[in-house]
Amino acid sequence: MTMNWQRNRLWRQVHSRPRLFIAVAVAVALAIFLPESVASHSVTRWLIAWNAGTVLYVILAAVMMIRSTPHRMHHRAQQQDEGQLTILVLVVVAATASLAAIAGELVVVKDMHGFIRFAHIALAGVTVLSSWAFIQVMFTLHYAHDYYAAACHGRPAGLEFPKEESPEYGDFFYFAAVIGTSGQTAEEIGRAHV
């Protein structure tokens, strides 16, 4: 009984977040099957895979966000009602692992010269950018979920958007990106729920 419940819960997580699980599957497959001639160090292999996964996820999420309407966002909030904490923990763990991998890559670089050295340093820089974009998109989805889930449960939303009754993903991305770059909340107003 417990195993069946856990399997159903896992399936609901995969089904409600296909973009995340597709990106993870592609990243893991790339890390496993990337030729050694492309990435001879394991840390380089995992950074390439991480970047491919995060960029794929950001692209898939952007396509979904562009095609979404407030009605679909409301429906998605109901569908993804569980597992929000798990997703945020995974984002923090992934970002921390990414930073550790960057540090590892920079250690590998110290004995390299010329174009190879430049390519490895560029990989570390691209990893910073792709990780930042990934985190902003994850928080965009988290903020949108919380906003519309509050409406599903009859609670006030945690954010107020000026002159906006039904904010779209672009509004939430703007909010996440402003916080992600400056720690400020711009025109949106956050409300604490006690």
Residue ranges and their predicted role:
Residues 1-13:
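Short, Lys/Arg-rich, polar N-terminal cytosolic tail immediately upstream
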Residues 13-36:
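The first (N-terminal) embedded transmembrane alpha-helix
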Residues 41-59:
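Loop-to-helix transition at the N-terminal end of transmembrane alpha-helices
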Residues 62-80, 103-113:
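Membrane-helix interface/capping segments
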Residues 73-93:
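Juxtamembrane helix-capping/reentrant segments at transmembrane boundaries
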Residues 128-154:
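Transmembrane alpha-helix/helix-exit interface in multi-pass inner-membrane proteins
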Residues 147-189:
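Membrane-proximal soluble regions of multi-pass membrane proteins
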Residues 192-194:
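Conserved small/polar residues in nucleotide/adenosyl-binding loops
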